[in-house]
Amino acid sequence: VTLPADVKEVFEGWHATDTADAGALADAKRRIEATDAAIANNNLNSKAIPYYYTGKALLGAADWIKGYTDDNYTITGTTRYYSPQFTKYDKDSVGLAYCSDESKAFDKNRKTGKVDKTAVTNKSYVFYNTRMDRNAKGVWQTSMLASVRGSAKCTP
């Protein structure tokens, strides 16, 4: 997965001592990068999306990417991900919650190149709550994903 030069992902504190948690964290990072690469590269058929997503989360990701494509938009800037927290369900499933700071990330019109810069508010911060399940190939796929923009859990 390759991101354009104007799209940056920063992962702060994304370290785990437990092997399973480390694997889930690594695949969550790759899932985020795959989603942004699909949007940035206008690629509705990215093979990385069904690789890192499954179930309802896969449907949600496909809709999210299609929304950008249909509106002729892409992304630009830097998104910071931080405060990852795990909940173990069993050896092959975990909950992963984390925050993102999108205060330096923006939508960009593909046609005009115009960047929609927005003021930094509490809505610039997003709380994510996900479920990840390890498949038969050992890949931690995101099966459920919910987000809350402006959550007090993530705002400074």
Show where each model-derived region lies.
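Core segments of small alpha/beta cavity-forming domains
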Residues: 2-74
